[in-house]
Amino acid sequence: MSNQHTLLISNLLPVGSNISTWWNFGSMLLICLTLQIMTGFFLAIHYTANINLAFSSVVHITRDVPYGWIMQNLHTIGASMFFICIYTHIARGLYYGLYLNKSVWLSGTTLLITLMATAFFGYVLPWGQMSFWAATVITNLLTAIPYLGTTITTWLWGGFSINDPTLTRFFALHFIIPFAIISLSSIHIILLHNKGSNNPLGTNSDIDKIPFHPYHSYKDTLTSTFMLITLFIILSFTPDLFNDPENFSKANPLITPQHIKPEWYFLFAYGILRSIPNKLGGTLALLMSVIILTTMPFTHTSYVRSMTFRPLAQTMFWMLIATFITITWTASKPVEPPFIIISQTTSIFYFSFFIMNPLLGWTENKIMMNY
């Protein structure tokens, strides 16, 4: 009996031997989450959720609190790193057909939506000029909901405009939701290891598995170290790389910025929102830009799981990546030609991937059957 237990421990979490570096982003995300919760806790100690004091409290943290500037910048840059890792993680899932493990994919999509909500609440907290106006624009989209829109918006704001109650509840939500993210992440990991990881070939790994530790754990440590080195280089040399210049001014409801935009990691969804002139249509497109990921397990038609051996699907995938980057770029620009037409065109390309992918799978099946 003891020999069986020893064998179990030494072979704890068997993993396919051929999984590549793209499989390391899960552990990198775990490190990002830990970093965000730790720095967030120390920032919350000194932060004041009041519209008259919030901006000053952030300045106080940066200037007066010992190592406060490190905590504040780590939290800001860490959020960007988090989204870089999660978008890469999702892209890997799309490329290698990991969405066919439905429970893992759907729990991951839920995690993404929760993360985006948390990041949005956090962006409002410094109460800078861009924080205030981005919050006003995004929360105002709720008024597009027929019949209930205005009531829901007033309830969320805690009044008839964004004010002190709004900031207080956004701070409360930004503090509490990360604990829900920890729970969802645990569920995501449990569901994944219930069936086991896929591999770049999209084949069954049961005949060729090795223990996660020490083989893959060292591989994870390497990429995580590179990520942390990059994080600290940005922190040391260009700490304001991801910040908006407008956000260094205190929120002023009487002055509207020339160009309102959220953080860079929301720009793809914001670009899709802006490309549609109708408010309700834009809001639905914004929601669908993320929710459409949930359709992937149900629209896979190809006999082959991974895109490794699907050249047509690969072309569509890299078009999606190029589209994602282009939408992000256009959304950071003012609403004027040629950015309007570029944004509208790329939005069509973005959604067309989710329509074309099953059609391509069906076409590839036909080609394979003929040979």
UniProtKB/Swiss-Prot annotation:
SUPFAM superfamilies: a domain/subunit of cytochrome bc1 complex (Ubiquinol-cytochrome c reductase), Transmembrane di-heme cytochromes. It comes from Sinomicrurus macclellandi (Macclelland's coral snake). Signal peptide: none annotated. One of its GO terms (cellular component) is respiratory chain complex III. InterPro entries: Cyt_b/b6_C (IPR005798), Cyt_b/b6_C_sf (IPR036150), Cyt_b/b6_N (IPR005797), Cytb/b6-like_sf (IPR027387), Cytochrome_b (IPR030689), Cytochrome_b_C_euk/bac (IPR048260), Cytochrome_b_N_euk/bac (IPR048259), Di-haem_cyt_TM (IPR016174). The chain crosses the membrane at residues 25-45, 69-90, 105-125, 170-190, 218-238, 280-300, 312-332, 339-358. Heme b b562 binds at H75, H174. Component of the ubiquinol-cytochrome c reductase complex (complex III or cytochrome b-c1 complex) that is part of the mitochondrial respiratory chain. The b-c1 complex mediates electron transfer from ubiquinol to cytochrome c. Contributes to the generation of a proton gradient across the mitochondrial membrane that is then used for ATP synthesis. It is a multi-pass membrane protein. Binds 2 heme b groups non-covalently. Belongs to the cytochrome b family. Heme b b566 binds at H89, H188. Keywords: Electron transport, Heme, Iron, Membrane, Metal-binding, Mitochondrion, Mitochondrion inner membrane, Respiratory chain, Transmembrane, Transmembrane helix, Transport, Ubiquinone. Heme 1 (or BL or b562) is low-potential and absorbs at about 562 nm, and heme 2 (or BH or b566) is high-potential and absorbs at about 566 nm. One of its GO terms (molecular function) is metal ion binding. The cytochrome bc1 complex contains 3 respiratory subunits (MT-CYB, CYC1 and UQCRFS1), 2 core proteins (UQCRC1 and UQCRC2) and probably 6 low-molecular weight proteins. Pfam families: Cytochrom_B_C (PF00032), Cytochrome_B (PF00033). This is Cytochrome b. Its cofactor is heme b. One of its GO terms (biological process) is mitochondrial electron transport, ubiquinol to cytochrome c. A ubiquinone binds at H193. It is found in: Mitochondrion inner membrane.
